[in-house]
Amino acid sequence: MAFTKCWLAYPEIRGCHCDAISLHTELTGETIDRAKAELAEGFKGLYGAALTEGDDITLALDMALDPEGYRLKAADGHCTIEGGSEVGVLYGVFALLRNLQTAGKAWAQFTADEEKASSNRLRMLNHWDNMDGSIERGYSGDSFFFKDSEILIDVPRLTAYARMLASVGINGITINNVNVKDAASWLITDRYFGALQEYLKIFTPYGVKLYLSINFAAPMELGGMDSADPCDPAVAKWWADKAQEVWANLPGLGGFLVKADSEGRPGPFTYGRNQADGANMLADAVAPCGGHIVWRCFVYNCQQDWRNTKIDRARAGYDYFMPLDGTFRDNVTLQIKNGPMDFQVREPVSPLIGGLQHT
């Protein structure tokens, strides 16, 4: 299937041709390799220039910068890009190429003095792709991650997608629908580890962490247990063991995205527990692996009678989560939908977004 490069096509800046632009760096590694490749492609497209060895551009680290931040300085045909990490350097490279295009100037005339730091540590996209290849609420074709319960490995397209994400600072992605069912429940098993390892090889060098949406009832559906009660020590052990297995096979995985107690799916409420009980149990399981739990707040009773005007479904998430503010583990992020209900013609911002102060 054909695909576009979006804003990374690097069209020629007319009248600004130059034969070569040189680069020097002592940095090594896969992310730096991606940065060099981006510069080479960008300069070839914008100026028709080859990327050679020299000191026109210097890539370096400055650990005083934000870990994902960068500093870009350019004048008189020379440019320095410093990052707080290799990913910061990559972000600086994308910033240079972006600024060159908006300036529309010859390389020797280009000037820049820019320093950026991340204001949000997690900048994630959630795909609602199903493993049969369909996309829930999808609007532009089928999934390029899944088909017929298998993981697709389209390296050129996935690489182009990872580039696009990195170019705008996206650093996390879940590839499967948060409504986890059927084959998707098995993504955390050896049935799919091999293919997911290929995804890690593609996304990780671009600073994009791979996350998986999981089934809260996995101890029952995968492990044959009678319960998924988050306060049951046997359930907690099952998840701790599963986390060790997953990260042993998928080192560098970002973590899990969880939708529980919503639209008929089981969760902590099924067992008389609260949302922090569920999120914290999983957080403790993945913490030794450096994992992160993203816990959705779109929780309500889907069997409520919409004709009962005394029931205010829109406040359900607020009522459930506000009393728990400050009780979640540090490796838990609560994911709040912009509005408290689906499919509204106009939608107020969820009061949870401004209400939670310690989570």
Predicted regions and their residues:
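Feature activates predominantly on carbohydrate-active enzymes
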Residues: 2, 6-11, 28, 32-38, ...
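Long, low-complexity intrinsically disordered regulatory regions in eukaryotic proteins
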Residues: 4, 11-23
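Structural motif
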Residues: 24-29, 59-63, 82-84, 129, ...
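Short acidic low-complexity segments
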Residues: 46-62
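A mature extracytoplasmic/lumenal domain signature
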Residues: 61, 131, 177-179, 262, ...
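Charged, often glycine-rich, active-site loop that binds/positions anionic groups
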Residues: 61-69, 308-315
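Catalytic-core regions of glycoside hydrolase
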Residues: 151, 227-359
